[in-house]
UniProtKB/Swiss-Prot annotation:
Function: Water channel required to facilitate the transport of water across membranes. Involved in freeze tolerance, osmotolerance and cell flocculation in liquid cultures. Is non-functional in most laboratory strains.
Lineage: Eukaryota, Fungi, Dikarya, Ascomycota, Saccharomycotina
Domain text: Aquaporins contain two tandem repeats each containing three membrane-spanning domains and a pore-forming loop with the signature motif Asn-Pro-Ala (NPA).
Protein name per the record: Aquaporin-2
GO molecular function, one term: water channel activity
Sequence motif: NPA 2, positions: 229-231
Species of provenance: Saccharomyces cerevisiae
Family, similarity comment: Belongs to the MIP/aquaporin (TC 1.A.8) family.
Region span, Disordered: 1-36
Topological type in the membrane: Multi-pass membrane protein
UniProt-listed SUPFAM superfamilies: Aquaporin-like
């Protein structure tokens, strides 16, 4: 009996307490030029998949939005109103961008995260939801997709390019900069609070994100044309072959907005708001009981 138990101990000596076989030790991988950056083949493959997802999602989002914007701005009956201020025109543009980003995020969130916006990617990077490397990897396809979508929309629709960003209603460059900053901050903060924060409703994050972009267009279109996305502004400018001297506000404003949104989100993390919210909920349930 003792011999059998000794044989059994020898046979299972390579198993850990959970029953996992630790007898096989994989050979050490040879060092490569990417080793010091902790980048292996799988990571590069994942970055490539994310880049493809961001390109497809951004292209689909902006192509639909550009074409809708062209239709809204092409109605001759609306020319008596200042550009972007007619209620019907404004609502059509806002709904076009809001719904376009909503279904694009739902389609590609599982592939690349569905940022579709360099400013949103920056806010996700600041919140450590994605790595700096992934942020940079996402920027390039987003910007290229914006230009591709602008070119495709321009080629497929007759007439002038009518989806560019421009200051209007007497808005100055400084006002336009702050409008773009705060409009982008609203969008980025919505992303951080609905997609990054762990909640039961995370799977529905595309809905409030689309609504926030809709509201940003309702508020900003008459004044700045609503950029809140450098890829969107650049793509339209390239398609129209026209860069106003204040085009920089459509880059600096959204990037500052990403920092502003992250600052608010980070303040809430420092205050550990979830602990107090959960405590209040628990106290309320006790009172009801």
């Amino acid at each position: 009996m003792s011999n059998e138990s000794n044989d059994l101990e020898k046979n299972i000596s390579h198993l850990d307490p959970t029953g996992v076989d630790n007898a096989y030790i994989p050979p050490e991988q040879p060092e490569t030029k990417h080793s010091r950056f902790n980048i292996d083949r799988d990571t590069l493959r994942n970055h490539f998949i994310a880049a493809v997802g961001e390109f497809c999602g951004t292209f689909m989002f902006l192509w639909c939005a550009y074409v809708i914007c062209n239709v809204a701005n092409h109605d001759v009956a609306l020319t008596t109103e200042p550009e972007g201020s007619h209620p019907g025109q404004l609502i059509m543009i806002a709904l076009g961008f809001g719904f376009s980003v909503m279904f694009s995020i739902w389609c590609f969130a599982g592939v690349s995260g569905g940022a579709l916006n360099p400013a949103v990617s920056l806010s996700l990077c600041l919140a450590r939801a994605i790595s700096p490397a992934r942020c940079v990897v996402m920027w390039f396809p987003q910007i290229i997709a914006g230009m591709a979508a602008g070119g495709a929309a321009s080629a497929m629709t007759p007439g002038k390019v009518l989806f560019t960003n421009a200051l209007g209603l007497g808005c100055s460059r400084s006002r336009g900069l702050f409008l773009e900053m705060f409009g982008t901050a609203v969008l980025c903060l919505t992303v951080l609070m609905t997609a990054v924060e762990k909640r039961e409703t995370n799977f529905m994050a595309a809905l409030p994100i689309g609504i926030s972009l809709f509201m940003a267009h309702m508020a900003l279109t008459g004044y700045t044309g609503t950029g809140v996305n450098p890829a969107r502004s650049l793509g339209a400018a390239v398609a129209a072959r026209y860069f106003p001297h204040y085009h920089w506000i459509y880059w600096i404003g959204p990037l500052l907005g990403a920092f502003l949104a992250w600052s608010v989100w980070q303040l809430l993390q420092i205050l550990d708001y979830t602990t107090y919210v959960n405590a209040e909920k628990a106290a309320g349930q006790k009172k009801e009981d």
